[in-house]
Amino acid sequence: MGQGGVAPRGRLAAARGAWLVFEDEAGFSMTPSHARTWSQRGRTPVVRVRGRSRRRISIAAPTCYKPGHRSRLIYRPRRDGGNRDGRKSFSWRDYRDLLIAAHQQLGGPIVLIWDNLNVHKAAGLREFAESRDWLTILYLPSYAPDLNPVEGIWSLLRRGWLSNVAFSTPEHLIRTVRSGLRHIQYRSKPH
């Protein structure tokens, strides 16, 4: 750590006039998460669920920060249709496309900070990053979710919009996740 609790490389994004971008991914299933709620005394609230469902969605979301600019949240859902042999998560090409879209939306260089997921270190993605002068990739230490602000977004979603909800269809799950992310995306101040 540098002076004042800031890492020595903490000025990399500022020196390049770049956006500081944290990225993470999460999966959400049709099975509702439990949260505390209230009800009249003697009446326990019950959320009814129609059987088990393997259908789920994965979401990759970069959060983008730059002094003097409004922070941004960009997200891409990926639906898992429940196929046993189909890909359930993002491929390196999906991440490449997400980074290209983020670069176009932000209109400037990116210093990307993400975890050590094996797909993040794939040869194709590494070659892509090396061939782009607008992209610098740094990795978080292993098992350090507290250093990634996107983890807080997943926590807000799970504790808020997705808690105690029985999703009737995968589309209902996707609509609810998007609604929660939009609310977080355009929230002017923390509550």
Language model regions located:
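Short functional hotspots at interaction and active-site rims
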Residues: 1-191
